[in-house]
Each structure stands twice: as C-alpha cells, then as structure tokens.
C-alpha cells in the first residue's frame, strides 16, 4: 500500500496530470426576481420584453455553452497545466444595468445578446460563450495566482506593471490565456472578436490589450504554468 500511495502522489505531481482532470461544470440559470429588485434599486426599469426573452432563450444559452464552453475550459487547463479550484459554478444571467458581467458572483449581463434590447451581439452567439468564458477565467486565474499582493508576489509581470490600474492588471494574464486558447483550438479570429468586444468598455481594457500585445501572450502563460499552488 505504501508503494501504491507513493505512486499516486507521484502521478499528481507529474506535468500534464492537471490537464487530464475534467473542467468545471458551468450551469446557467435565470430568475426575474433579481432583475426586478436590481432595476428598482438602480432606478431603471427592466427593458420591456427582456425578462420574457431570457426565459424563452435560456435553453438556447445553455446549449451554446454546452457546445463550445467545456472545450475552452479544458484547453485553458491543458495550456497552464493547472487544475481548476472548483468543480461546478452557476452563472446567473440578467439584464439589470446596475451590474456588468462579473466573475464573483458569476453574473452575465445578456443585454448585448437580446433582441428586446437591440443587443449588438444578438446575431453573434459565440460572443455569449466568450463572455462566460472570460468571467470563468477570472476565477480560474485567481485560483492560480491569488489576488492583490499575493498575485504580485507570484508574477514579475504584475510587479512590472504595478502602476497600472487594478482593472488593467486583472486582465493581463486573462487576455493572454484567452488568446492562447483560441489560437490552440484554431479560432484566431476569436482573439480579434474578444478584443473588439473589450475595447469599447474603457481605457483600462485598451491598455491591457496593448500590454499583452507588447509582451506577447507567452510570458503571461508561462507565469501561470510555473505558479505554485
């Protein structure tokens, strides 16, 4: 038994073992109650027909993710050789203007994807998957590097760019890994699509993409691979 135990421990320490573990399961759900309460709190009503459209299209959103999302998460893990720190998570979709999409709690604002809101990505279903992938990567990368000072202690690149805004720094490793995933699966056009979706959000995102362009994605990915848990 002692020999078997040593063998099992050795297997978990071998490179590539993390990549063989399953990616986390991402569930997608919706409750109109959140939109009602949130819209009331921010003083902006839910767009007419938006809640009804989400209810009608919820299964569509789930199918979109089921078709492409797991492959993206698995590829990210294969690239970093780091396991996910969670097995399952729930993404709550909503349309409240008070909350953008975020990773913790995992909220996906679907205004951009609805006909009721004249969303710019209503005919780009892959961008819903990209948004959910983006937010899930935030949690994944926090689990690898940690947050704040802990992340900086593990990343020479974060120390190099310590004067940048928190939003910019939080997106450096993410943009690099996201881009590498799309290249790995043969969808380099999605790198351009993700960039085009990010840039209108604000200058912090513009700066993050510029830094990753300057440094290249590989140095950031290498830090994720070498980070000790």
Question: What does each of the following model-derived ranges do?
Answer:
Residues 5-16:
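Bacterial N-terminal signal peptides
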Residues 19-55:
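N-terminal low-structure segments adjacent to metalloprotease catalytic domains
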Residues 21-22, 46-105, 185:
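Auxiliary, metal-adjacent structural segments of Zn-dependent hydrolase domains
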Residues 56-66, 117-122, 127, 158-165:
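Second-shell loop/turn segments in exported
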Residues 82-132, 142:
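Active-site scaffold of zinc-dependent metalloenzymes
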Residues 137-141:
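Short active-site segment of divalent metal-dependent hydrolases/proteases
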Residues 144-146, 151-204, 208:
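Post-HExxH zinc-binding segment in Zn-dependent metallohydrolases
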Residues 211-229:
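Long, charge-rich low-complexity segments
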């Amino acid at each position: 038994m002692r020999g078997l135990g040593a063998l099992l421990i050795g297997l978990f320490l071998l490179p590539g073992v993390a990549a063989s573990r399953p990616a986390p399961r991402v569930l997608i759900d919706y409750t109109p109650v959140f939109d009602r309460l949130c819209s009331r709190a921010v003083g902006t009503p839910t767009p007419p027909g938006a809640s009804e459209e989400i209810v009608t299209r919820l299964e569509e959103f789930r199918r979109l993710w089921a078709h492409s999302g797991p492959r993206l998460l698995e590829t990210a893990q294969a690239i970093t050789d780091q396991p996910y720190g969670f097995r399952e998570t729930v993404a709550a979709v909503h349309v409240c203007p008070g909350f953008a999409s975020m990773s913790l709690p995992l909220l996906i604002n679907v205004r951009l994807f609805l006909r009721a809101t004249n969303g710019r990505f209503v005919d780009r279903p892959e961008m819903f998957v990209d948004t959910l992938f983006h937010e899930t990567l935030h949690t994944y990368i926090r689990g690898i590097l940690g947050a704040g000072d802990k992340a900086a202690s593990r990343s020479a690149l974060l120390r190099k760019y310590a004067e940048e805004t928190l939003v910019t720094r939080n997106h450096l490793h993410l943009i690099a890994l996201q881009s590498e995933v799309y290249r790995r699966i043969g969808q380099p056009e999605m790198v351009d699509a993700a960039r085009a979706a990010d840039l209108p959000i604000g200058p912090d995102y513009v700066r993050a993409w510029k830094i990753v362009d300057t440094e290249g994605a590989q140095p950031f990915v290498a830090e994720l691979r070498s980070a000790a848990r």
